[in-house]
Regions:
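Short hydrophobic beta-strand element within catalytic cores of glycosyltransferases
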Residues: 65, 69-72
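A charged, aromatic-enriched C-terminal amphipathic alpha-helix characteristic of glycosyltransferases
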Residues: 107-136
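Nucleotide-activated donor-binding/catalytic signature segment of Leloir-type glycosyltransferases, i.e.
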Residues: 12-31
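Conserved acidic donor-binding segment of nucleotide-sugar-dependent glycosyltransferases
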Residues: 85-94, 101-107
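Short alpha-helical segment that forms part of, or immediately flanks, the ligand-binding pocket
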Residues: 38, 57-65, 79
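Aromatic "clamp/platform" in nucleotide-sugar-dependent glycosyltransferases that forms part
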Residues: 52
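Short alpha-helical donor nucleotide-sugar binding micro-motif in glycosyltransferases
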Residues: 30, 38-44
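A short hydrophobic beta-strand element within the catalytic core of glycosyltransferases
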Residues: 47-48
């Protein structure tokens, strides 16, 4: 599934034209309802974040909170910050394939490791973000 709001519908149409009529790939769009978002994470095995730039994407913490491995590319490797379950790939098919196979072959072990991460409590997260912003 490709979740999120596309910057333009033409981008989504272009992607569909490349992959064809593959019923394994869905485009649910932006999901704002909490229950549907949790269901989306739980119905997938991995989060792939293809961004070239990111600040601190909540999607990574959300996926890890559901014990889903996250595959990112080296452009945004600064977001790891010691968390378990985030894997970094170069932007080439060999690196991506190798890391994907590792995740598939070690999935249960990776989920156990992700469970060792310390996640901020939701009620404290906005206070923590506010504290960080006010220090700058």
């Amino acid at each position: 599934s490709i979740i999120g709001k596309a910057k333009s519908s033409s981008l989504q149409e272009k992607f569909k034209s490349i992959i064809g009529d593959d019923h394994n790939i869905r485009f649910p769009g932006y999901i704002s309802e909490r229950k549907k978002l949790i269901d989306a994470y739980d119905s997938h095995n991995i989060l792939i974040l293809p961004s070239y730039t990111e600040g601190q994407p909540y999607v990574v913490d959300e996926a890890l909170a559901r014990r889903r491995p996250v595959l990112i590319f080296e452009d945004i490797s600064h977001i790891i910050k010691g968390r378990k379950g985030i894997f970094v790939s170069k932007r080439d098919i060999n690196s991506f394939s190798e890391i994907s196979k590792y995740i598939i072959n070690n999935y249960k072990k990776i989920q156990e490791e992700i469970g060792k991460n310390k996640f901020p409590l939701e009620k404290n997260m906005f206070k923590q973000i506010s504290d960080i912003i006010s220090k700058n």
